[in-house]
Amino acid sequence: KSALIPWLANIPLRIGYRGEMRFGLINLSLDNPSKTNRPPMVNHYLALCDLMEHPEGIEINTSVDPKLNISPAAKQSVSTKLQAVAIEKKSIYVLCPGAEYGVTKRWPTEHFASLAQHLINNEPNANIILLGGKGDHALGEEIISQVKNTAQIQNWCGETSLDEAIALIGMSKVLVSNDSGLMHIGAALKVPQVAIFGSSDPHHTPPLSDKAKVIWLNLPCSPCHKRECPLGHLKCLKDISPSTVLGAIQTLH
């Protein structure tokens, strides 16, 4: 469908990947890599840009280093919110329990709760902030309900603008997230982070940062790219223990 629109609009140069009955709709094309051998997504689309400049297929460097600026107004807004609840910036761990895609990208809430408890027990000055959209608020409440010392953990899911979420992540000591948009924000901000993968492929959508630690079990059934576990066990996420994630966090310091 996406290839049909530029054809109907009489756009002269229509670049894309072959397949899906696109013959004639695109006039500059590449073979679509198989799902079992996909390059990182950024490289996947940069290859089309390269094709426009080098239709003869010259291979050029497509390595990228994403960067993101923090809005001064958002930074001030978040600082004010943190001061209101007496949270010091140097002690913030941001945990992002959500993933819009579905449960096969979400590390279990009980694991997030256990990790939060470990951080609080091991670091008395630690403050945990749960971050996400409005749809993640219930996940945040589930996590908090399983944690003692709830004065050190707050649910900000659905309570920030996108700019404020970016600013908060930029202030964090460590970011722990699923494979989600907030993970990529953390990577672009070069924040120390742990990225947890389940049904998706960290080779295809990795956090592009040298400060990121990826945890992926690489089970025979993974990546399945399904919204629900076809086998009904969700071992790709459930078998990632909180202690494993805690160990990854400790290597970031």
Summary of predicted features, one role per range:
Residues 1-253:
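Catalytic machinery of carbohydrate-active enzymes
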